[in-house]
C-alpha cells in the first residue's frame, strides 16, 4: 500500500513539474523569436517589414533632399508597383518633368495612407496623382472590402485637399487575374466596382478622375496583351502601356 501511495504521489508531482517545464520552453522560444526579429529583417507581402509595415524608410532620405529643394510645380505620384515601375520603363517622364515617384511595389491603400504625410504632404507639391487599390483586391495585406479600399483613397484625397494640394484620383487599371494570388476570383468585376466608387466620389467632390481603365481595357476586363502588358504578367503595364498612361495624365497636368 505504501509503495502504491508513493508511486502515485511521485507521478502527480512529476506531471506538475512537466507542465512547468513545457511552459518554460514556450516562454523561452517566444523570447528567442522576438530577439531574432530584432536582428533579422522579416519582409512581409505589401512592400514593408515587421519593423516598418508602411515602408516609411524607403524614401526617407530622398524626401529630406526634396524638402530642402521645393518646387512650386511639383507633382507627386502616389501608388504601388505600377507607379514605381513607371520610372524603370521611362525615367525621363519623371526627370524631365517636376514629377516625384512615390510608388512602392506591393503596397495597399492602408500602407499608403500611413506614409501619405512624409511621402506627399511634407514635399509640398501642387498636386498629387493617386493610383491605388489593385493590391488590396489581391489581398496583399489581408482581406478588405471594396468600400474600405475606396475610403482609404478618399482619406488620402481629403488630407491632400486640407493642405491645399490638388488631387487627381486614377482608375485602377484593368485586371482579370493575379498570378501571385490565383485564388482571388472575379477580379475584373471588383476593379470595376472600385472604379465606380472612385468616379462617383470625384464627381461629388469636384475632383479630377483620371480614367486609365477605359483606354487600356481589352474588352474583357483585362489589360490588352501584348499591347499594354505581357501574357505572363496581366497586371503591370509594359513600355507601351506606360506611354498610354502618360498621354492620359499629361492631358490633366498640361496646365501645371
Spans of model-derived segments:
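Active-site segments of SGNH/GDSL-like serine hydrolases
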Residues: 131-137, 158-191
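C-terminal motif of bacterial Sec signal peptides marking the signal peptidase cleavage site
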Residues: 30-32
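Sec-dependent signal peptide recognition
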Residues: 18-24
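Solvent-exposed loop/turn segments at secondary-structure junctions
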Residues: 81-85, 105-109, 134-138, 173-177, ...
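N-terminal secretory signal peptides that target proteins for export/translocation
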Residues: 1-17
Amino acid at each position: 500500500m505504501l509503495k502504491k501511495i508513493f508511486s502515485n504521489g511521485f507521478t502527480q508531482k512529476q506531471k506538475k513539474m512537466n507542465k512547468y517545464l513545457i511552459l518554460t520552453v514556450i516562454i523561452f522560444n517566444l523570447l528567442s523569436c522576438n530577439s531574432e526579429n530584432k536582428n533579422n529583417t522579416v519582409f512581409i507581402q505589401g512592400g514593408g517589414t515587421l519593423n516598418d509595415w508602411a515602408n516609411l524608410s524607403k524614401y526617407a532620405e530622398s524626401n529630406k533632399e526634396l524638402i530642402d529643394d521645393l518646387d512650386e510645380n511639383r507633382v507627386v505620384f502616389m501608388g504601388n508597383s505600377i507607379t514605381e515601375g513607371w520610372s524603370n520603363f521611362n525615367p525621363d517622364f519623371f526627370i524631365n518633368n517636376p514629377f516625384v515617384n512615390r510608388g512602392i511595389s506591393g503596397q495597399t491603400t492602408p500602407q499608403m495612407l500611413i506614409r501619405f504625410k512624409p511621402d506627399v504632404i511634407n514635399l509640398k507639391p501642387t498636386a498629387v496623382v493617386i493610383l491605388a487599390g489593385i493590391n488590396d483586391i489581391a489581398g496583399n495585406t489581408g482581406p478588405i472590402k471594396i468600400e474600405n479600399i475606396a475610403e482609404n483613397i478618399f482619406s488620402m484625397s481629403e488630407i491632400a485637399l486640407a493642405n491645399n494640394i490638388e488631387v487627381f484620383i486614377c482608375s485602377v487599371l484593368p485586371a482579370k487575374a493575379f498570378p501571385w494570388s490565383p485564388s482571388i476570383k472575379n477580379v475584373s468585376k471588383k476593379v470595376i466596382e472600385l472604379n465606380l466608387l472612385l468616379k462617383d466620389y470625384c464627381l461629388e467632390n469636384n475632383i479630377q478622375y483620371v480614367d486609365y481603365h477605359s483606354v487600356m481595357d481589352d474588352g474583357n476586363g483585362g489589360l490588352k496583351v501584348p499591347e499594354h502588358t505581357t501574357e505572363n504578367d496581366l497586371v503591370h503595364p509594359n513600355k507601351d502601356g506606360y506611354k498610354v498612361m502618360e498621354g492620359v495624365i499629361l492631358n490633366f497636368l498640361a496646365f501645371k
